[in-house]
Amino acid sequence: SVGFKAGVKEYKLTYYTPEYETKDTDILAAFRVTPQPGVPPEEAGAAVRAESSTGTWTTVWTDGLTSLDRYKGRCYHIEPVLGEEDQYIAYVAYPLDLFEEGSVTNMFTSIVGNVFGFKALRALRLEDLRVPTAYIKTFQGPPHGIQVERDKLNKYGRPLLGCTIKPKLGLSAKNYGRAVYECLRGGLDFTKDDENVNSQPFMRWRDRFLFCAEALFKAQAETGEIKGHYLNATAGTCEEMMKRAVFARELGAPIVMHDYLTGGFTANTSLAHYCRDNGLLLHIHRAMHAVIDRQKNHGMHFRVLAKALRLSGGDHVHAGTVVGKLEGERDITLGFVDLLRDDFVEKDRSRGIYFTQDWVSLPGVLAVRSGGIHVWHMPALTEIFGDDSVLQFGGGTLGHPWGNAPGAVANRVALEACVKARNEGRDLAAEGNEIIREASKWSPELAAACEVWKAIRFNFKAVDTLDPERE
């Protein structure tokens, strides 16, 4: 005899435990599970838990060398999704000892590693995570956070304004720097490298950094305002990424940038630590996110990627506009924006938030609005997202018929008009267009922008929508 019962047993016999009471130290997950025909939801939910904790496909004798009951993940509740056939939300608890401290990489490797390829599942999506306070305290988080950034920039009481330099690829470093200067001189707070601007043959990174630094210091001197350009440090190796961040700091630049999903969480966390130690702000782009989060029944919701970014570290992150060209349903978007900015967020299924999340004073992240927005969107953006956001107009600045600087002027005037109207008690949602028209009477740059983009709409139905609420 081998001393144990060999063979295969159903996952639900071990990992489905509806009587389990969750602990404050557990990582909790909500999965949207779509089982294959004939697979009970309890078995599908338990299978996910097994593969992401202590399980394998058969009983093994080394199970007897540890306490599986202590370390196994547990599926503690399953509920059907209203309006969907054969779709369930499975709630899972993971013991904290399964995860390495301060490692988003390890957390995701465990929770969303192999399980998404299970044959027993037609589809699987991670909808939300509750990260326990004990685990949060092992992370540095954002390099600086919202309040420290405002203090560094000396900018209060309004959203920050940015612009992505276009065309994103093909400009020489000097012409690129010229566009940066014109936008900053016109009134923007930031300009930005696009996510795929790294170090290509037409514009090597060092040349771009030098011309952009010259542009922002010249604009600062002429306006008396602190300016920044998101210098993209993303590179093919972590060593090269850090070399670029070091050079940016040596130039005196206030902010660098990273593509956190394509660059990876290990690289991102390393860069965030360097930024805190050296006084650099860190702008995060979410390139590749829609590959992971776009489909409603498979992948991972962006609210999970947003929480992971806050743990890994970033002072800004792109997070949808609601009104522009990119995906973003209002209630869902505001839910994960609060998860980025606020210190404590209550469970609220009407906004897609499955768990109450306490961030125990981890610094917050500014949500960046970008993608197909222009001056007519300014009232809605100001009203929806409030002051703690970055409004980034690429084509909505550089597409101005009079040039880059007038495009920046138009956006700054529109923003100041909206903030002033809001502070006077006017309703931006109801009076937004009138507020912009009034401001355009004394700003020819804004008037020209209003004329160009008066008929631009992106009216497409969102792919990712909320489930019907349970009674």
From Swiss-Prot:
The EC code for this enzyme is 4.1.1.39
Taxonomy, superkingdom: Eukaryota
Catalytic function, reaction form: 2 (2R)-3-phosphoglycerate + 2 H(+) = D-ribulose 1,5-bisphosphate + CO2 + H2O; D-ribulose 1,5-bisphosphate + O2 = 2-phosphoglycolate + (2R)-3-phosphoglycerate + 2 H(+)
| Chief subcellular location | plastid
Binding of substrate occurs at: 114, 164, 168, 286, 318, 370
Which Gene Ontology cellular component terms are annotated? chloroplast
Keywords, A to Z, come to: Calvin cycle, Carbon dioxide fixation, Chloroplast, Disulfide bond, Lyase, Magnesium, Metal-binding, Methylation, Monooxygenase, Oxidoreductase, Photorespiration, Photosynthesis, Plastid
Instruction: Give the cofactor binding note.
Output: Binds 1 Mg(2+) ion per subunit.
List site positions: Transition state stabilizer. 325
Entry's Gene Ontology BP terms: photorespiration; reductive pentose-phosphate cycle
UniProt PTM comment: The disulfide bond which can form in the large chain dimeric partners within the hexadecamer appears to be associated with oxidative stress and protein turnover.
On this chain, the residues bearing N6-carboxylysine are 192
**Residues bearing PTM N6,N6,N6-trimethyllysine:** 5
Specify the signal sequence span. none
Which cofactor names does the annotation list? Mg(2+)
Please name the GO terms that the record assigns under molecular function. magnesium ion binding; monooxygenase activity; ribulose-bisphosphate carboxylase activity
- Catalytic positions are 166, 285
Q: Which Pfam families match?
A: RuBisCO_large, RuBisCO_large_N
* Quaternary structure annotation from Swiss-Prot or TrEMBL: Heterohexadecamer of 8 large chains and 8 small chains; disulfide-linked. The disulfide link is formed within the large subunit homodimers.
Family classification: Belongs to the RuBisCO large chain family. Type I subfamily.
The further comment given in this record reads: The basic functional RuBisCO is composed of a large chain homodimer in a 'head-to-tail' conformation. In form I RuBisCO this homodimer is arranged in a barrel-like tetramer with the small subunits forming a tetrameric 'cap' on each end of the 'barrel'.
Q: What does this protein do?
A: RuBisCO catalyzes two reactions: the carboxylation of D-ribulose 1,5-bisphosphate, the primary event in carbon dioxide fixation, as well as the oxidative fragmentation of the pentose substrate in the photorespiration process. Both reactions occur simultaneously and in competition at the same active site.
Its name, as the record gives it, is Ribulose bisphosphate carboxylase large chain
